[in-house]
From Swiss-Prot:
Positions of WD repeats: 6-47, 50-89, 95-137, 140-178, 182-220, 226-265, 272-308, 313-353, 360-410, 434-476, 482-520, 525-563, 568-606
GO biological process: actin filament depolymerization; locomotion; sarcomere organization
SMART domains, A to Z: WD40
Gene: WDR1
SUPFAM superfamilies reported in the protein's UniProt record: Nitrous oxide reductase, N-terminal domain, TolB, C-terminal domain
Function, in words: Induces disassembly of actin filaments in conjunction with ADF/cofilin family proteins. Enhances cofilin-mediated actin severing.
Subcellular locations according to the entry: Cytoplasm, Cytoskeleton
GO CC, one annotated term: cortical actin cytoskeleton
Name listed for the protein in its UniProt record: WD repeat-containing protein 1
Keywords, in A-Z order: Actin-binding, Cytoplasm, Cytoskeleton, Repeat, WD repeat
Gene Ontology MF terms: actin filament binding
Family named by the database record: Belongs to the WD repeat AIP1 family.
Length: 609
């Protein structure tokens, strides 16, 4: 028997980045994948085809760093609470092998010895800033001392005799010999925070990079200084990350001066300078050199594949969301199905549902959370945002234009579109009717707080769900909206509602974990009630077949229900593990799209036996 549901595609979130803080992109010893973190997730992506992704979500707290063991069989990931998890990479389930708490506080970096047997972990613990121990028992194999402030970076020489280096906010790097690892001496060449330390793959050298714009090269075995790259300053801004070439001859650096550079370390000269732009979001916070791939990470969260032959234009740029996705819709355009998603930073992204190729709209868009979106019959994406505007964006152009943003009197939180150029917008304490991108009618003094709205596909009827647990029906009459004086009762405060595509049913979900379906032709009598969610249901979407609909909740679960029989249902547990499901949409009768506060978009194949 086929599984009733199967994950088809995962369009992963971007790395979570912060201005002025370096971000680690972990490499894969086998060369296939790369790793980074966003929120509680570790994202594993295929380096040749980044649309192939896997998301690990077993940390209870925000994860900061994740790195493969040199064997390639395990990944170690560390979070803000000081938990280090070591987990299997060979199985889809990613079974936990070991969990340690080397110190209480944020883990900022970690490093393995080449035999995958020892791990060094550094960060901002309360009683110590680092630890080094055996991977299978947690027994200490030395001490990380010598710093009096948070340690940002650690690395271990991948050839014997082992050496270990650290970089700290005390403006110093430190050098250790071992095992057991013992502090040998401090390197105080830098004048600002040391952000990154890395040994070359052959172990002959290690490099340190700092907020002072300098990179120093040292002997990997003795720790003696060899040179400063560029003679003095390597970059005009702070340097956040460095990564060696596989043959140890060159070094990639990423800087707040909005450039990345390749250095010939032996000749002490710049081979290439990659100018990434002029916007503050073009600051470079991370980098990775793996096989022939050179990756750098911008403050925008975008991942750039650098082109040595054309330094001013990346080969490709991976885009997407780095903040939680709040809403979603889908639309067919020229035979292709596109997914549109909006996040809580105002960013709207569109995705080719087949390939995962994606981009944002050009121009200046929403400046705050996008709360709801829909596509109208004119092929415009209609969106409302906490910036108090409703926007109409032409989907064939995909660029924001100033004249198509309509200012609301109060903050909008939900909208629905209908035939005839109508949009109904719910603002706080107000319902606004718009026609052809203009406000034409408003109802204030509602006596209840409107939360969700749907327009009947035949036009004319509007259903508004309130926090008081009622659904009220209205009629569009020309340029006004009239109450029908008809109220339907949900089982709790209404969170979302939707008409089936044929207009026969209205499904209403509520904060009391229930979905109620009303039959429209029969005067909105209650047709069926659907129980199953363990927490507030927040979103609902009808399949094009009008016989099934999906609901998503704060319990991380998605259900696909059969209208005629509440017992015939498909349950997708942990659709987005540890994160609320925030949006649902159907590409076709058997393909469901889900989005979540984990900033990822997933496609599921649904089959009915």
């Amino acid at each position: 028997m086929r599984m009733p549901y199967e994950i088809k595609k995962v369009f992963a979130s971007l790395p979570q980045v912060e201005r002025g803080v370096s971000k680690i992109i972990g490499g894969d010893p086998k060369g296939n994948n790369f790793l980074y973190t966003n929120g509680k997730c570790v994202v594993i992506r295929n380096i040749d085809n980044p649309a192939i992704a896997d998301i690990y979500t077993e940390h209870a707290h925000q994860v900061v760093v994740a790195k493969y063991a040199p064997s390639g069989f395990y990944i170690a990931s560390g979070d803000v609470s000081g938990k280090l998890r070591i987990w299997d990479t060979t199985q889809k389930e990613h079974l936990l092998k070991y969990e340690y708490q080397p110190f209480a506080g944020k883990i900022k970096d970690l490093a393995w010895t080449e035999d995958s047997k020892r791990i060094a972990v550094v960060g901002e613990g309360r009683e110590k800033f680092g630890a080094v121990f055996l991977w299978d028992s947690g027994s200490s194999v030395g001490e990380i001392t010598g710093h009096n402030k948070v340690i940002n970076s650690v690395d271990i020489k991948q050839t014997r005799p082992y050496r270990l280096a650290t970089g700290s906010d005390d403006n110093c790097a430190a050098f250790f010999e071992g095992p057991p690892f013992k502090f040998k001496f401090t390197l105080s060449d830098h004048t600002r925070f040391v952000n990154c330390v890395r040994f070359s793959p052959d172990g002959n050298r290690f490099a340190t990079a700092s907020a002072d714009g300098q990179i120093f090269i040292y002997d990997g075995k003795t720790g003696e200084k060899v040179c400063a790259l560029g003679g003095g300053k390597a970059h005009d801004g702070g340097i956040y990350a460095i990564s060696w070439s596989p043959d140890s001859s060159q070094l990639l650096s990423a800087s707040g001066d909005k450039t990345a550079k390749i250095w010939d370390v032996g000749a002490n000269s710049v081979v290439s300078t990659f100018n990434m732009g002029s916007n503050v979001l073009d600051q470079q916070l991370g980098c990775l050199w793996q096989k022939d791939h050179l990756l750098s990470l911008s403050l925008s969260g975008y991942i750039n594949y650098l082109d040595k032959n054309n330094p001013d234009k990346p080969l490709r740029v991976i885009k997407g969301h780095s903040k939680s996705i709040q809403c979603l819709t889908v639309h067919k355009n020229g035979g292709k199905s596109y997914i549109y998603s909006g996040s809580n930073d105002g960013h709207i992204n569109y995705w080719d549902s087949d390939t995962g190729e994606n981009d944002g709209f050009s121009g200046k868009g929403h400046t705050n959370q996008v709360s709801r979106m829909a596509v109208d019959e004119m092929d415009q994406l209609v969106t409302c945002s906490m910036d108090d505007t409703v926007r109409y964006t032409n989907l064939s152009k995909r660029d924001y234009s100033g004249q198509d943003a309509v200012k609301m009197d109060v903050q909008p939180k939900c909208l629905a579109v209908g035939p005839g150029g109508y949009t109904v917008v719910l603002c706080i304490g107000q319902i606004v009717l718009m026609k052809d991108k203009k406000k034409c009618f408003a109802i204030d003094d509602l006596g209840y707080e409107p939360e969700a709205v749907a327009v009947h596909p035949g036009g004319g009827s509007v259903a508004v769900g309130g926090t008081d647990g009622n659904v009220r029906l209205y009629s569009i009459q020309g340029t006004s909206l009239k109450s029908d004086d008809k109220t339907l009762e949900a089982k709790g405060p209404v969170t979302d509602l939707a008409y089936s595509h044929d207009g026969a049913f209205l499904a209403v979900c509520d904060a009391n974990k229930v979905v109620t379906v009303f039959s429209v032709p029969d005067g909105y009598v209650e047709h069926n009630v659907f129980y199953g969610h363990h927490a507030k249901v927040v979103c609902i979407a009808w399949s094009p077949d009008n016989e099934h609909f999906a609901s998503g909740g704060m319990d991380m679960m998605v259900y696909v229900w059969t209208v005629s029989d509440p017992e015939t249902r498909i349950k997708i547990p942990d659709a987005h593990r540890l994160h609320h499901v925030s949006g649902l949409a159907w590409l076709d009768e058997h393909t469901l799209v889900t989005t979540s506060h984990d900033a990822s978009v997933k496609e599921w194949s649904i089959s009915y036996n």
